[in-house]
Amino acid sequence: MGTPVACGIDVLRADSFALLKAKRVGLITNHTGVAADGVATIDLLHQSEGVELVRLFCPEHGLRGTAENGIKVEDGKDPKTGLRVVSLYGESRKPTAEHLDGLDVMVFDIQDIGARFYTYIATMGLAMEAAAEAGIGFVVLDRPNPIGGHRVEGPLPGGELSFVCPHDLPIRHGMTVGELAQMFRAERGLDQLDLKVVKMDGYRREMWFDDTGVPWHAPSPNIPDLDSAIVYPGIGMLEFLNVSVGRGTKAPFRIMGAPFIDGAALAAELMAAELKGIEFLAIDFVPSKSKFVGEQCSGVRIRVTNRDRCQPLEIASAIAGHLAREHREAVLFDEKIGVLLNHPKTAERLQDRTVALNDLWEADEESFLRRRKAFLFYR
């Protein structure tokens, strides 16, 4: 490995925070907002001469990244700096005028993982809208897309946008947060927003996170490592079904099952499908949190054998098809499959194992690849 990638915060720091001098700053961040030497962006801005850090904002999972998914996060105070912390995953998901009072600029420094329904990008988009309405600036400190910027996968939304589907993106979008911010500004009509992206040094699109030399900080409690992040855009899509996706195990999103599933039969069917870059092993497990706590579950363990060939949405579609055929009522398939998938045509065809679902998405993927070109920073 060569010289590590310098993330946006490191580039800003090397320039003595010039972009923020004489500015009153509101910082949207969490535990992943750290420089290469492990110093938190909060502390760097708070200690920087000429930068006035006024207020902190946190996303889902809170400032320290310890709150479980879907649990409201309360406002609070940062014990180290004494600054007010405004939760953007509590009573408000979009900053209010009162939250932005007295600020000149908002700064966003959070590690995303590259999936449409991972909520940090929804938080960024709503904060950009609020900043535009308030007439203040917005700065994104860019970070790598952990699962690579060279691949996109999945359909564009076929239904209404929401907090878990915040923009017209495929499920695996292959963009950094800085690139997405550029797209959001252009496509949401935020022309009045003074947006600046502090780009990374040394980043290339084909990089996986462990190619960058940037230290890994688990972006949320159930994405402990890169392997979980790689399969998340697929297995995460099954989250609202009545199955365990491995929360409360040592391998979240790499284990899935339920008490009523025959893990051996599911593993055999999935291996027979010869999906690229992946193996399935039958497993029995007992989740310690989320669904089926303390219950014996049967299902599969997912092992990535070639991440460059692995297609997370293909994996999820094969599993969802089995569930639709064998356990439709038990998994609440008709009621829940569309929540994160947001593509009725795919939901309708999942149960037919003879259908190549990738064909449904090919036009969406190609049109998105063309559309995103104008917003890409890195080759």
Question: Where are the predicted features?
Answer:
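N-terminal phosphate-binding or glycine-rich loops at protein starts, especially the Walker A/P-loop
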Residues: 4-51
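Short internal beta-strands
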Residues: 52-61, 141
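Glycine-rich, charge-decorated loop segments at or immediately adjacent to ligand/cofactor-binding or catalytic sites
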Residues: 65-69, 139-161
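Glycine-rich oxoanion-binding loops at beta->alpha junctions
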Residues: 69-103, 115
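Glycine/threonine-rich flexible loop motifs
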Residues: 112-124
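Conserved anion/nucleotide-ligand pocket segment
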Residues: 161-234
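Glycine-rich, aromatic-lined ligand/substrate-binding cores of catalytic
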Residues: 203-205, 209-280
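Conserved functional hotspot residues or short segments at active or partner-binding sites
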Residues: 252, 257-360
